[in-house]
């Protein structure tokens, strides 16, 4: 190991690493800011421009893109022709490339970032050097991760070189690094970048033309939000003990996005390691509790809500959510949209739960809850009620289903009353509450609710009437005077009839069945109020 090229944006640990290389007699060449950092630390270093015989130009856009650099990286030591050509042109070998890239992902995490700012953080020379070194891994080491510095330096001190397995491992990490980098760029440009360009195009002022004149070529329709090639980049957060079942291997990955309230950025304060099912259920709980502005508590079991409630205080909201289904909550997950206080913690501690999620936990609440050594506590920070960034995706054999998130807000003002009886203001509030919950229940879904509390949840049934019967049976006598929400239309009036028999006072459903009139007529006969939303909420 005689010569190393170092060019890093993230300078964490680079001075110590470079000093270790210099102590081993390795010549160091470097670019721009890295050169100045190493020189300022008193480390012997030559500038790439000196080695290449060509200065940095275009405001630093061209620094290392030189044949004198890339030939020194790509030359195969065992190839006599390669070595002869290097000698002919006076090019020296480069044995180690240490590079990390401009922070594109961190830059575009800012929602206000401009297209120009994003473009300036697209690294060109760095990925080229990394790929060149990785391609020639049999002769060249490549380091893209500062966490690797100590191990690389230790091996060089011990043997004077890097073993083939080490270089192969570094090569693999390098290609993963550049693939993730390019994927992040392509993904952002295909979504937010495209939106910015489309907005600019729509904002252009059309030239004036005489009345009746040919308008000329028309602007194309807005482009699809779905790119022709979808590049996805995820970073492994942790290995999981197993998947949904013990015989399935599993891991958890993050997309690295910085905005919003999402489970991938929750901070675990206490308890056992999260499992695959824990994370899946925690995601379901968090996305549902984000629906509510008022204090709300959500209990989840197998990704379905079993108890949901809103109230003036978070302690009261949890009490109501627990009382909604005192059986199913056992071993479940609870999410709160307000910080957990001592009163709420005392109530939570009396039940066996897997996880409690909250924006934060008061010190006195932590004192209570941490007595349960296995209870996982997740803090998610102030609640951002927006959906996760990007797309909602589902893997299928040989492909990927991609859609926008079901993020439409429930707006009772826009709902259409279709029966002679209209819901009262109190019933309308409960209908809105019930529909927010119903949106997060596996289809076919029916929710019975009253006074900001679920009374019955019919989930995942193969026909709608069975979902309704389950929810109404769970509600029992409490169904009288309550409301009922359905995630999709009624194909027959049977759900209306079952609701009427149970004493339901008002119904909300999307409408859209060819038999809507039959359901409306039956509701009128039973004296029920019913409104149509026009929006279906299937969930599978």
Swiss-Prot record:
It catalyses: (6R)-10-formyltetrahydrofolate + 5-amino-1-(5-phospho-beta-D-ribosyl)imidazole-4-carboxamide = 5-formamido-1-(5-phospho-D-ribosyl)imidazole-4-carboxamide + (6S)-5,6,7,8-tetrahydrofolate; IMP + H2O = 5-formamido-1-(5-phospho-D-ribosyl)imidazole-4-carboxamide. It holds the Pfam family MGS. The keyword Transport does not apply. Gene3D superfamilies: 3.40.140.20, Methylglyoxal synthase-like domain (3.40.50.1380). Keywords: Hydrolase, Multifunctional enzyme, Purine biosynthesis, Transferase. Residues 1-144 form the MGS-like domain. GO terms for biological process: 'de novo' IMP biosynthetic process. Pathway: Purine metabolism; IMP biosynthesis via de novo pathway; 5-formamido-1-(5-phospho-D-ribosyl)imidazole-4-carboxamide from 5-amino-1-(5-phospho-D-ribosyl)imidazole-4-carboxamide (10-formyl THF route): step 1/1; Purine metabolism; IMP biosynthesis via de novo pathway; IMP from 5-formamido-1-(5-phospho-D-ribosyl)imidazole-4-carboxamide: step 1/1. One of its GO terms (molecular function) is IMP cyclohydrolase activity. Its EC number is 2.1.2.3, 3.5.4.10. SUPFAM superfamilies: Cytidine deaminase-like (SSF53927), Methylglyoxal synthase-like (SSF52335). The keyword Hydrolase applies. It comes from the Bacteria. Residues 204-224 are annotated as: Disordered. GO terms for cellular component: cytosol. The IMP cyclohydrolase activity resides in the N-terminal region. Belongs to the PurH family. PANTHER family: BIFUNCTIONAL PURINE BIOSYNTHESIS PROTEIN ATIC, BIFUNCTIONAL PURINE BIOSYNTHESIS PROTEIN PURH. This is Bifunctional purine biosynthesis protein PurH. The gene is purH.
């Amino acid at each position: 190991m005689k010569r190393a090229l170092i060019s890093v944006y993230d300078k964490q640990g680079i001075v110590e690493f470079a000093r270790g290389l210099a102590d081993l007699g390795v010549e160091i060449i470097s670019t721009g800011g890295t050169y100045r950092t190493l020189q300022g630390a008193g480390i012997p270093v030559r500038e790439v421009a000196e080695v290449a015989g060509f200065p940095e130009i275009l405001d630093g856009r061209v620094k290392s893109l030189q044949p004198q650099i890339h030939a020194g990286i790509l030359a195969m030591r065992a190839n006599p022709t390669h070595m002869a050509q290097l000698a002919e042109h006076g090019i020296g070998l480069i044995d180690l490339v240490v590079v990390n890239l401009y922070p594109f992902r961190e830059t575009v995490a800012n929602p206000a970032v401009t297209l120009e700012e994003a473009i300036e953080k697209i690294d060109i020379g760095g990925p080229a050097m990394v790929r060149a070194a990785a391609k020639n891994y049999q002769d060249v080491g490549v380091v893209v991760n500062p966490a690797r510095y100590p191990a690389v330096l230790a091996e060089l001190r011990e043997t004077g070189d890097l073993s083939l397995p080490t270089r192969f491992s570094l090569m693999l990490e390098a290609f993963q690094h550049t693939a993730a980098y390019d994927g992040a760029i392509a993904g952002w440009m295909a979504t937010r970048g495209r939106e910015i360009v489309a907005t600019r195009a729509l904002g252009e002022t059309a030239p004036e033309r005489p009345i009746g004149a040919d308008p000329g070529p028309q602007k194309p329709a807005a482009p699809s939000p779905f790119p022709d090639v979808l590049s996805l980049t995820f970073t492994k957060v942790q290995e999981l003990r197993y998947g949904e079942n013990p015989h399935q291997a599993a891991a958890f990955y993050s997309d690295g996005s910085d905005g919003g309230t999402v489970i991938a950025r929750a901070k675990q304060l206490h308890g056992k390691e999260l499992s695959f099912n824990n994370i899946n259920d925690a995601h379901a709980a968090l996305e549902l509790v984000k629906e509510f502005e008022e204090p709300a508590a959500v209990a989840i079991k197998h990704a379905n809500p079993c108890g949901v409630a809103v109230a003036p205080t978070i302690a009261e909201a949890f009490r109501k959510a627990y009382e909604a289904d005192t059986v199913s909550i056992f071993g479940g997950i609870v999410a709160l949209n307000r910080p957990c206080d001592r009163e709420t913690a005392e109530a939570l501690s009396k039940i066996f739960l897997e996880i409690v999620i909250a924006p934060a936990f008061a010190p006195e609440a932590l004192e209570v809850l941490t007595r349960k050594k296995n209870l996982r506590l997740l803090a998610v920070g102030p609640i951002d009620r927006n959906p996760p960034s990007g797309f909602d995706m589902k893997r299928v054999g040989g492909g990927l289903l991609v859609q926008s998130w079901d993020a439409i807000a429930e707006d009772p003002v826009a709902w259409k009353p279709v029966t002679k009886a209209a819901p009262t203001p109190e019933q309308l509030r409960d209908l809105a509450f019930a529909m927010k919950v119903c949106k997060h229940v596996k289809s076919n879904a029916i929710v019975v609710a009253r006074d900001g509390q679920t009374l019955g949840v019919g989930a995942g049934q193969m026909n709608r009437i069975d979902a309704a019967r389950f929810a109404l049976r769970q509600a029992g006598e409490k169904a009288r005077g309550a409301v009922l929400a359905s995630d999709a239309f009624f194909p027959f009036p049977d759900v209306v009839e079952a609701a009427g028999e149970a004493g339901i006072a008002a119904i909300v459903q999307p409408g859209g069945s060819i038999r809507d009139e039959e359901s409306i007529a039956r509701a009128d006969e039973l004296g029920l109020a019913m409104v149509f939303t026009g929006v279906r909420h299937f969930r599978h």
